[in-house]
A protein has these predicted regions:
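Acidic, glycine-rich two-metal-ion catalytic cores of nucleic acid-processing enzymes
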Residues: 200, 204-306
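N-terminal leader/targeting and assembly helices and adjacent pre-domain segments
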Residues: 1-199, 293-308
Length: 308
């Protein structure tokens, strides 16, 4: 069967659902992959705990050095010595973390998260097609190369994003210690600031998990819908208190996959446009989803059988 013959067969199988209309919107709303987000948060949190463990092993020695240099007669020389000691200690933390990372199997865990996101997205897509078009999809079609490039890029990028966390965190902690020394802060004050920085790192890791799962889900949704001949979608927000004003305003509106809307935010002076154009899930930590709009003239899905 040629591609054209297959498309004609699909159109014949689903035309009853269109009831004479050219386009129909999905009868179901795809669910955001919350289970994948939770799993990715577990991965990032586990990595941050490794970082904390390595840091806590070196921190007592750093604080001992801090205490000794505070008693030095020459603050300038003491500052230089402390800077060198802190730098070496944090380099050691980074090396130990790299060794522990091999046992943590970060690459494998991130790949599992990507696969879980794909499975969730595919199940939602199958549900949408069944509810709206009355057909079952051919599962094998979505295996192999269909998602492979997007998944591989996402995995590689996120492994690097996670691995970059210690560089930023350890750099911030080094600054906290050295600035504290120059300002004459107590050991207790320094430790509190370090704990605060760790909390910020943990929150940022959780934000990374939410943002990147949404990004991957958005990429997969776009692949599925455009492959099925859907050139348009309806924006659907998560409809809770965390939804941004911009996304709440976009909710329910129709957009083209080749023309994403521009993002904005409100200020006291009025609306400010960011210059960023995003589909659902592409804005930072966006949990919105794209509801497909099917067109009888272009619809083409890997049909398994027509529902009786």
């Amino acid at each position: 069967m040629t591609n054209q013959q297959h498309q004609l067969a699909v159109q014949e199988a689903v035309k009853g659902k269109f009831k004479g209309k050219k386009v129909i919107k999905s009868r179901s709303v795809p669910h955001y992959p919350e289970s994948a987000e939770r799993e990715f948060k577990r991965v990032t949190n586990g990595y941050i705990r490794l970082l904390k463990k390595c840091l806590m092993e070196e921190l007592p020695g750093i604080m001992d050095e801090y205490r000794r240099e505070q008693r030095s007669d020459s603050r300038f020389d003491a500052s230089l010595k402390l800077a060198e000691k802190v730098k070496n200690a944090l380099i050691k933390v980074a090396r130990e973390l790299e060794q522990k990372l091999a046992k943590y199997k970060l690459n494998e865990l991130v790949r599992k998260v990507a696969k879980l996101t794909k499975v969730n997205s595919l199940n939602e897509w199958k549900r949408v097609c069944e509810d709206t078009l009355g057909i079952d999809l051919l599962d094998d079609y979505y295996n192999g190369d269909f998602y492979e490039d997007a998944l591989r890029r996402w995995v590689d990028e996120n492994i690097q994003k996670i691995k970059s966390i210690p560089n930023d965190t350890l750099g911030s902690m080094q600054k906290i210690i050295l600035d504290g020394f120059r300002e004459g802060k107590t050991i207790t004050a320094i430790q509190k600031e370090i704990q605060k920085e760790y909390s910020v790192t943990r929150r940022n890791a959780q934000l990374l998990a939410r943002d990147q799962i949404a990004t991957l889900n958005a990429q997969i949704s776009k692949l599925q819908q455009e492959d099925a001949g859907c050139s348009k979608y309806k924006w659907s927000s998560s409809k809770d208190s965390r939804v941004r004003d911009c996304h709440r305003a976009l909710d329910g509106k129709i957009f083209s996959w080749d023309d994403p809307p521009e993002m904005w935010y409100e200020t006291k002076s009025g609306r400010v446009y960011t210059g960023r154009h995003c589909h659902p899930g592409e804005d930072i930590a966006c949990r919105c989803v794209a509801i497909p709009v099917f067109d009888i003239d272009t619809v083409d899905v890997p049909i398994k059988s027509k529902k009786s």
